[in-house]
């Protein structure tokens, strides 16, 4: 029989083990960030006017990449964003008002968004926190049944620089999405498009092929990582209902007007080389009763123009790989 001091030592050692693991993980992540390439070292500059035209299927001029963001906001944390500031401007937990604003999207707004895409025969990409598959399986299943693409968007919505073990979080996200859909996700979007210096190395290491965090182009381009190239697919920060409706406080038709103007420009310019127009929406914003008619009108406007296709991220990735291989 073990003596009391031995038992106490064993308990102390067991208690210290998680802290030691966390310390090693933090040290490794800090080292990875120090050794990682800077963002501006991961790609070569390329002026779009200097590039040879990319081959596209006959009749295609403009690729539209629609993205719907489905997130898990934990009521025990500060909210990822606020529509209404608490009295006195102090952040509070639980922030019931802003949490409820987001939850409206999961209970009401998402069903309007799903119906609008169904009516226009468009299957978007869904940027999804993996935990949604566990806490809101009704939403995730409806998207899966509608043929939406699942793009990994971390496990739960929180700043990426606060994640203690990014590798583990990325693996967890992949495992949950694969278990729910039966397919391994190929695309990644960071929360708030956030990254630490080493994030893209972790993403490539986990087997992802493409990501949407960088907004600096209207065509895909390769980004270098320690584990081979990742394809950056341009995901617009300007055509996003957060920036338009929440940050800039536009009227309910603000996204329709901006999207129509952007679409017309890219559709005209695409005569000289294919362009990608992307837009991002959130169910608690675009799915609101006073905005859904304008969201639907935006889809209708794009749908009726000639030479336009609506593609998911993996389709864009595969097309670009084939197009650049043929042009090599």
Predicted features and spans:
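Short amphipathic, positively biased membrane-proximal segments
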Residues: 1-25
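Catalytic alpha-helical scaffold of carbohydrate-active enzymes acting on polysaccharides/glycoconjugates
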Residues: 24-232, 256-279, 285-328
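A conserved mid-domain beta-alpha-beta active-site/ligand-binding segment of alpha/beta enzyme cores
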Residues: 234-265
